[in-house]
């Protein structure tokens, strides 16, 4: 793993020189970042992430952070004696779990991220789907992947109806960094827990983002031998889903990546969030730290 603090000054200068063309290329562009995995729970990686986001803003890009919070939600549920349950990579969310999800995501995780970014010199503002009517949602209908005639009731898990990016754009124009919790609201003002990968993908599409970066706990998409696949098309991904290579929690992440790529996001990267500054190195150098998804 590459740690920028361990790099010699001359090598750092070369990295900065390499970064200049990318800074020019992506100046003024929106970069949507799905922040999750170890990068959210390791204090050193948290600090690295905040610094990277601030640096992207300072060099003229517009980072938008969409965060997860699975481990933190799981910890809170265990404290309450409640067992988490997943179906096809989605958390089953009853009314009691929904209260925990809202409290953990908007009241704990989001505020921690906002604080870290502000501490690193940025101006972060926390949002949920309710703020400015950002994310309207409805109850997700989950069809069984093996039996299409069967549906699973997974509670207050939301399917995005629409995204109004006005509040995000207003914050960007005023030099703020939006930090978004994946919570939506329905017609009756009910709350919905929405998969953060899906929110990041849809938001990247609506904002016409240059890149969608998905930080995760693995090197990227791996083949059955455990080797990294550096680049994939939508068709190749379909084959990996059918043969079981891609499964579980990776399914919504991959579905979101394909959706964004097909909807006009120029580049979608699933990045190894365990590597210090991996996101920054992925954007500003020729080095790759994950899998790039393209539509064809």
UniProtKB/Swiss-Prot annotation:
GO cellular component, as recorded: cytoplasm
Alphabetized UniProt keyword annotations: Amino-acid biosynthesis, Arginine biosynthesis, ATP-binding, Cytoplasm, Kinase, Nucleotide-binding, Transferase
Subcellular location: Cytoplasm
Any single biological process term in GO: arginine biosynthetic process via ornithine
Binding site for substrate: 69-70, 91, 193
Record's keyword annotation contains Cytoplasm: yes
UniProt EC number: 2.7.2.8
Biological pathway: Amino-acid biosynthesis; L-arginine biosynthesis; N(2)-acetyl-L-ornithine from L-glutamate: step 2/4
Organism superkingdom: Bacteria
The reaction(s) this protein catalyses: N-acetyl-L-glutamate + ATP = N-acetyl-L-glutamyl 5-phosphate + ADP
InterPro entries per the UniProt record, alphabetical: AceGlu_kinase-like_sf, AcgluKinase_fam, ArgB, Asp/Glu/Uridylate_kinase, Glu/AcGlu_kinase, NAGK-C
Class of the enzyme per the UniProt entry, highest EC level: transferase
GO molecular function: acetylglutamate kinase activity; ATP binding
One of the Pfam families matching this protein, by short name: AA_kinase
Principal subcellular localisation of the protein: cytoplasm
Site (Transition state stabilizer): 34, 253
Role, per record: Catalyzes the ATP-dependent phosphorylation of N-acetyl-L-glutamate.
Family, per entry: Belongs to the acetylglutamate kinase family. ArgB subfamily.
PANTHER family: N-ACETYLGLUTAMATE SYNTHASE, N-ACETYLGLUTAMATE SYNTHASE, MITOCHONDRIAL
Name of protein: Acetylglutamate kinase
Organism: Paracidovorax citrulli (strain AAC00-1)
Gene expressing this chain: argB
């Amino acid at each position: 793993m590459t740690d920028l603090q361990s790099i010699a000054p001359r090598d750092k200068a070369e990295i900065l020189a390499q970064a200049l063309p990318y800074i020019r290329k992506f100046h003024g562009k929106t970069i949507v970042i799905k922040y999750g995995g170890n990068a959210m729970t390791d204090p050193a990686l948290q600090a690295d992430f905040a610094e990277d986001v601030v640096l992207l803003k300072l060099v003229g890009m517009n980072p938008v952070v969409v965060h997860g919070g699975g481990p933190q939600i799981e910890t809170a549920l265990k404290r309450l004696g409640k067992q988490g349950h997943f179906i096809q990579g989605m958390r089953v969310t009853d009314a009691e779990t929904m209260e925990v999800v809202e409290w953990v995501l908007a009241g704990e995780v989001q505020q921690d991220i906002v604080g870290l970014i502000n501490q690193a010199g940025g101006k972060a503002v926390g949002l949920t789907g309710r703020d400015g009517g950002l994310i309207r949602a409805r109850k997700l209908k989950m069809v069984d992947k093996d039996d299409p005639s069967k549906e699973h009731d997974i509670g207050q898990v939301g399917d995005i109806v629409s995204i109004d990016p006005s509040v995000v754009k207003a914050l960007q124009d005023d030099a703020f960094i939006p930090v978004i919790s994946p919570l939506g609201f329905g017609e009756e003002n009910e709350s919905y827990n929405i998969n953060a990968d899906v929110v990041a993908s849809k938001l990247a599409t609506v904002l016409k983002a240059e890149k969608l970066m998905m930080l995760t706990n693995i090197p990227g998409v791996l083949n059955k031998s455990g080797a990294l696949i550096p680049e994939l098309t939508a068709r190749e991904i379909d084959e990996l889903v059918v043969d079981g290579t891609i499964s579980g929690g990776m399914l919504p992440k991959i579905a979101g990546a394909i959706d964004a790529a097909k909807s006009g996001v120029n580049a979608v990267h699933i990045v190894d969030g365990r590597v210090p500054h991996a996101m920054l190195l992925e954007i500003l150098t020729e080095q790759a730290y994950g899998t790039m998804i393209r539509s064809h």
